[in-house]
């Protein structure tokens, strides 16, 4: 049987109550607590993939970007399948994250970075709706990366570290894509202590807008 049979089965029921004790059958890791770091890593990656899907569904992205993200979503299922099977399992996993997965992401980062403006400082997550959702997806992916590293540390012979490295590269890709989604309007730049400066200037009768974050190319 496939490692993802429980995920894709069309057979009812959709609930069994078997996990009501706080334990679950996690792939070929067997019966584990739902609070196990391996389950947490699996769940965080599932959420990360969903966050990518939201960014895609919102629209406003070029076909080249959506095509790349569609490939990423398939990779994320490879990653989830990988996490479901220990590295030292006697039978091979349905899929494993390999160096080739990382290479594809690195090439995508290099490609899309050429479409974004030069980075001259820290930028805030925002701008267009497409950019904001890509920034949000990046934050979720970074959390998933930390969760996978925790699983690698706890089970070094069972959890594939390439899965964590893939998520690291994916967060870089999402950052580059978010900046690309803002290319027409510019990045939202970080202004250190902007709120405090605005308050002080307002108290002194100065237009507070002069101290608020602005957008490159707009103000």
Where are the regions that the model predicts?
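Phosphate/pyrophosphate-binding loop motifs in nucleotide- or prenyl diphosphate-using proteins
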Residues: 1-219
